[in-house]
Amino acid sequence: MDKVDTRYDIGTETILHEGNELIDISAIAAAHAPWWNRTLCAVNDTWVRLGVMEGDFHWHKHDDQDEFFFVLEGRLDIELEDRTVVLEPGKAFVVPRGVMHFPHARGRTVALMVEQAGVVPTGD
């Protein structure tokens, strides 16, 4: 179950597309406000999510799940406790489970995220 946080428009429990459907990521991403996050589809035991982000998220971690980020447009800085990872279009990064991280989108950023089904995007 997603945590309720009014700063972010996050609704990952509903899967928007089933298998054997065309997914128009550009059209979906164009229609939403900053820090919008939805599950596009399920692939086996994982969710593929689309995030439209701008500005700061918050420090958080996922105790039992790794988190994969792939930037499609914009720039996403992921601050870790010991460094900052800069993701621009075509770049990807895996935040290992249990690692504190602070995503910051420098301007409007669109990214795909892949995580275990049932993830709470706001952290544990």
Residue ranges and their predicted role:
Residues E81-R97:
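Short acidic-glycine-tyrosine-enriched beta hairpin
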Residues N44, L72-E73, E88-P89, G107:
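A cytosolic small-molecule/anion-sensing beta-strand core signal
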Residues R97-D124:
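Ligand-binding loop in jelly-roll beta-barrel domains
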Residues V52-E54, H62-E79, V114:
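Short, conserved beta-strand element in jelly-roll/cupin
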Residues N44, E79-R83, R106:
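Short strand-coil-strand connectors
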Residues A33-P34, W47-D63:
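Conserved short histidine dyad/triad with adjacent acidic residue
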